[in-house]
Amino acid sequence: MLVLCRSVSGKSLPENARIMGETDETDFSPLQIGQQYKVYGVMFYTSRIDFLVSPASGGPMWVSSNLFDVVDDEIPQGWGCVLTERSEGYADLSEAFGIHSICGYLELIRSYSHYVGILERDPEELKIFYSQ
């Protein structure tokens, strides 16, 4: 699955799709307009969908799908999904942020410590991430 970045500005997010304090001034750097990104995961909120992408200069980050156009819509072979409210660890994401489910490579959806590790830039977890 590939997406094309068409904006790095919070202005591109509809009001009802803004979460965690996002505003018009929110800057989604290190994304680059016109750059294609491989999608490593898809996260479903009530009001929006996020893609897990990895800009060359920033590492893995979840970003609203509102900032992208889908270039290749094929879901990668071997992906799975986790329903957050029913899964240990992931239930925290449901309660705290309203995340309903995550789809992605198996380590992402089967290991909450891996999910947290890539966001916290744990070297061992990043090694797994970049092997995808």
For every predicted segment, state its role.
Residues S9, M43-Y45:
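Short, charged beta-turn/beta-strand-edge "cap" motif at the junction between a beta-strand
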